[in-house]
A protein has these predicted regions:
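Single conserved hydrophobic/aromatic residue that forms the stacking wall/gate
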Residues: 2-13
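Glycine- and acidic
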Residues: 65-75, 152-160, 214, 252
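Basic, alpha-helical terminal appendages of large translation-related enzymes
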Residues: 215, 220-221, 230-318
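Secondary-structure capping and boundary motifs in well-ordered enzyme cores
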Residues: 36-41, 76-79, 117, 128-129, ...
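Catalytic adenosine-cofactor/nucleotide-binding cores of aminoacyl-tRNA synthetases and other
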Residues: 107-200, 291-317
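Active-site and channel-lining beta-strand-loop segments
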Residues: 24-33, 40-41, 89, 98-120
């Protein structure tokens, strides 16, 4: 971000008058200038206006008030001058509020190289979506990139992240919890009962999770927000291993039920927090737990609710 800020300020100091027209002799297409039919508008000038007209500027004042000014204007670092110099100048001159923040993100590289058609190293996201689904692709892109920096894509790192985070940690936890509930509790979510110290530790972390994640998102640290959620899920997997409800249920059914309720509630909370990134797979998880309410608080999972059958959430990639 510091590099982008420096570039933006540097461009302000060295910037001269900007020509916003192009002669039709050079450019046949474009919006004709109302005061000179021999010229059209420079594309970056008329294109920028779409940011405000699309949300109702000069058309719907209520809609415009709702959506503008933007909290964040997220752009690529290669078009920083256009958005950090030209665009604010246009808004100032029109008496329109500026975006509250302009954030320039980096590039996705193939290995160490910038993606280029001439080099033949372009990764087609539609091919990834076809093979692995849109939610895992969205998860990987959000998790791997530190916004503001460049990031490197390899199919090997994608598969490793998918199997580690999604298949092993998240998907496997759902499978364990729902399988044990179906087998030992007739498919009905058990009562949480009196919480042990370990249960209370998970609950305390769950109660603090939403605030931490929201702060990371506000700071545009999306990778850290996701990692915070996944650390919580990994902690719940460890909690399951330490308590072994599949063994405990033989002698202490209430105790095993308490553990499964806690793990199920952790899954619910994790799914709600990850739903903006993986709306489809998290909906599958919430449907499996028969949860309809999207709530960031702890204790929303209803004991006595019958869970539903579901396909494997994230089948491992071999």
């Amino acid at each position: 971000r510091d590099e982008s800020e420096s570039r933006g300020l540097g461009d302000v100091y060295k910037r001269q008058d900007l020509c916003i027209s192009r002669p039709k002799s050079r450019l046949e297409w474009g919006i004709e200038l109302p005061f000179d039919k021999q010229y059209v508008t420079y594309v970056w000038f008329d294109a920028l206006i779409n940011y405000v007209t699309a949300v109702g500027f000069n058309q719907s004042s209520e809609n415009f008030k709702k959506w503008w000014p933007a909290s964040y204007h997220l752009i690529g670092k290669d078009i920083l001058t256009t958005h950090a110099v030209y665009w604010p100048t246009m808004l100032f001159s029109a008496g329109v509020s500026l975006p509250l923040s302009i954030f320039a993100h980096g590039w996705w590289l193939t290995g160490e190289s910038k993606m280029s058609k001439s080099l033949g190293n372009v990764i087609n996201p539609m091919d990834l979506i076809k093979d692995y689904g849109v939610d895992p692709v969205r998860y990987y892109l959000m998790r791997e990139m530190v916004l503001g920096n460049d990031s490197s894509f390899t199919i090997e790192s994608f598969i490793q992240r998918y199997n580690s985070d999604l298949a092993n940690d998240f998907g496997n936890l759902l499978s364990r919890v729902t399988t044990l509930i179906k087998k030992n509790y007739d498919g009905v979510i058990p009562e949480p009962g009196d919480l042990s110290d370990l249960d209370l530790s998970i609950k305390k972390k769950g109660e603090a999770l939403s605030k931490t994640v929201h702060q990371y998102v506000d700071d545009m640290r999306l990778n850290d927000a996701i990692e915070e959620i996944m650390q919580f899920i990994r902690g719940v997997n460890k909690y399951m291993e330490e308590n072994a409800p599949w063994k405990m249920v033989k002698e202490d059914k209430d105790g095993a039920g308490r553990i499964l309720y806690t793990a199920g509630e952790a899954l619910r909370l994790g799914a709600v927090l990850l739903s903006p990134i993986m709306p489809n797979r998290t909906k599958t998880l919430l449907d499996a737990l028969n949860v309809k309410e999207r709530n960031f608080s702890w204790g929303i999972l209803q004991a006595g609710t019958r869970i539903k059958s579901h396909e494997p959430l994230f089948p491992r990639i071999k």
